[in-house]
Amino acid sequence: MRVLIAEDEAYLNRILEKVLAKAGYAVDSCADGQEALEYLESTDAYDAAILDIMMPRVDGLTVLRRIRERGSDLPVLLLTARDAVESRVEGLDLGADDYLTKPFASQELLARLRALLRRGGAKQAAVLAVADLRLDPASRRVTRGGREVALSAREFALLEYMMRNAGMPLTRQMIEEHVWNYDYQGGSNVVDVYIRTLRGKLEIQGEKRLIHTVRNVGYVLREEA
């Protein structure tokens, strides 16, 4: 699942990115509300947004208002100061789904985010399917021919990204940027290692290969005829 973070405190922004990425989310982050609006206008692929209320240029409440004015039901979690009662009330009245006061524990952030996604607001919560492979983003459950497949958070994020783009060849750069959330440096074999592990877990009982190598490009997930 893909989450947008808008937080102007650089240190907290980096922490949020790391926490969500480690939990298996694809993350885009920005430092002000204007950037957040530009991200939101460029794609409708986000499953949730985490917005700091107090940001430069455009504040979090204005971003939230614009989201709701467009008719979007995107789940929104507001980050607020402990004494910002009026802002929290205004945010909830504008259509925020929840809020979290600073400072907060990463476990609580993740729990609140999971709760938002469970409530049905995520646009991409439908079960993904390719051949006999099933991935449920909401329950984070993967099965192959009815067999449960245990995946790490990163393996789950990789498989989800490939299933959302089934049939489309994906370069290593695309995979690293979307799943690992850092710029591609070249020379790294991290994608190849994870693909090999994922194949092993999906083909443990001799099932047909679904993740194929595309020479000089990268990988593609598709069902062979």
PLM regions with names:
Residues 1-123:
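N-terminal/domain-start alpha-helical segments
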Residues 2, 114-173:
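Short, Lys/Arg-enriched segments at the junction into DNA-binding effector domains
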Residues 175-181:
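DNA-recognition alpha helix
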Residues 59-62, 89-90, 157, 174, ...:
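Active-site phosphate/pyrophosphate-handling residues
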Residues 105-118, 150-160, 172, 186-204, ...:
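DNA-recognition element of transcription regulators
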Residues 223-225:
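Intrinsically disordered, low-complexity protein-interaction/activation regions
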Residues 22, 26, 42, 69, ...:
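Conserved amphipathic alpha-helical interaction elements at protein-protein interfaces in regulatory
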